[in-house]
Regions:
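Active-site proximal loops enriched in glycine and acidic residues that flank catalytic Cys/His/Asp
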Residues: 27, 43, 47, 60
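Catalytic Zn2+-binding segment of zinc metalloproteases
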Residues: 35-49
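Conserved catalytic/binding loops enriched for acidic/polar residues
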Residues: 17-18, 22, 50-420
Length: 420
């Protein structure tokens, strides 16, 4: 689906060789990954930050943009095993000659590996969005998570602008364009998590007493603020808006081919809802920014602090300049998602009390701001009035937060258990 969405390949009934080669490259990579498990090797989710140094990572396809603005998948997956893999094989399976002190020899292999700067992050410090190691991520790319997110957003923009009937095979129902659209519209979903781990993040190694590995160090404050800004850029209505031509292409579903968990969950019945994708994308970003564990780490660190996240979200939504057209509808939806997210955190009994207090304070400050506003636009007046109603209702009865229907996210990770 990703290849179909990126390349819009179906000029006629033939399947372009680029798609076949990408599929074969992925199969080869996955085969090497499973052989690695057979040999006893665990995942290394930091490999993507070191030029794809291991097949034991979960690789996201590398998409390049050519000088002419074309999308290039020729190096979507790496060839062969990586340098980290060679080091692990050397350590585990080296056949030492007689008379060699094997323990000392293996220790030298380990010391050399550390000295060469290889990184390793295990499953436990990578899978959850709450984890703090910036290098521990699934389905990400690049040494610079922020730079890679910005690159993926450009790739996404190109693919969405070119999205057409050519994204599905001739003879397929046009509504099934939505299944191809989902992974392209949410192309950045895993890179969002990678950027999020810079916020309140901490670099660390699995040190042993007496080894040469570095101690823990926090992500610099300026870098954390860059990460916050990069994530907020993903909820800009102009970024979330779909081209109107694309929206018009996705007609109501044909009989016996209903919407599924692989499509967006909208509010417009059988008609494609152009706001539903935006709601899903905003939810992906907010669940990273409003993660209770991350928020607590920010509070403990002092700078940039959880206030940097709250103030940034409010500036990007409620306090942003008014939009028009469909952008305004998307902006109002995103604003309410921020409000509900803050209220949810404020009344989350498992969250840190300082985080809860700051979240509730932000909601009350927003309520006071809304009370002073009197926009001319009728839709905005209604939006503000509804927001104030929701603030009063949910503060009086926090249990009602459980009745809110969250954005339904289409499945993302193709594999994901600890053993795969």
């Amino acid at each position: 689906l990703i290849a179909e969405g990126l390349l819009a390949p179906y000029v006629d009934e033939t399947v372009p060789p680029e798609m076949l080669e990408m599929s074969l490259a992925r199969i080869r990579q996955l085969s090497a990954h499973e052989v690695g498990h057979t040999l006893g090797f665990e995942h290394n989710f930091a490999a993507s930050t070191q030029n794809r140094s291991s097949v034991m990572d979960y690789p996201f396809p590398l998409v390049k943009i050519t000088a002419t603005g074309e999308l290039d998948l020729s190096e979507a997956y790496d060839v062969g095993i990586g340098e980290w893999d060679k080091r692990t094989v050397l350590y585990a399976y080296q056949d030492f000659p007689d008379g060699v002190d094997r323990a000392a020899a293996r220790q030298k292999i380990m010391d050399d590996t550390i000295g060469q700067g290889f990184k390793y992050v295990a499953d436990t410090d990578a899978r959850s969005i709450s984890t703090s190691h910036p290098d521990g991520n699934l389905w990400d790319n690049g040494a610079d998570a922020i730079q890679e997110l910005e690159h993926l957003m450009k790739v996404r923009e190109i693919a969405l602008q070119r999205f057409s009937e050519r994204n599905i095979r001739i003879g397929r129902p046009l509504p099934t364009l939505e299944e191809v659209l989902v992974p392209i519209y949410l192309l950045h979903r895993f890179q969002i998590e990678a950027v999020g781990k810079l916020i309140g993040g901490q670099y660390f190694t699995y040190r042993l007493r007496g080894d040469a590995q570095e101690g823990a160090r926090p992500v610099p404050v300026a870098r954390q603020q860059q990460a916050i800004n990069a994530l907020l850029a993903t909820i800009d209505p102009a970024v979330l808006r779909l081209p109107q031509g694309l929206v018009d292409l996705i007609t109501p579903r044909v009989p016996n081919n209903p919407k599924s968990r692989e499509t967006f969950s909208g509010a417009t019945g059988i008609n494609f809802d152009p706001v539903a994708p935006a709601r899903s994308a905003v939810a992906l970003t907010l669940r990273v920014l409003l993660d209770p564990t991350r928020a607590a780490r920010l509070e403990r660190a002092g700078a940039p602090g959880f206030d940097a996240v709250i103030n940034g979200m409010l500036a990007a939504t409620w306090y942003a300049d008014a939009s028009t057209g469909i952008d305004a509808v998307i902006a109002r939806q995103a604003s309410l998602q921020v409000l509900y997210g803050l209220l949810g955190l404020a009344f989350d009994a498992s969250a840190d009390n300082n985080v809860r207090a700051r979240s509730l304070s932000a909601v009350q400050e927003l309520d006071a701001w809304l009370a002073r506003r009197s926009p001319r636009d009728q839709a905005m007046r209604a939006h503000y009035a509804f927001a104030r109603h929701e603030i009063d209702r949910l503060q009086d009865n926090p249990a009602a937060l459980e009745t809110l229907v969250p954005a339904t996210l289409p499945p993302g990770s193709p594999i994901g258990s600890y053993s795969e």
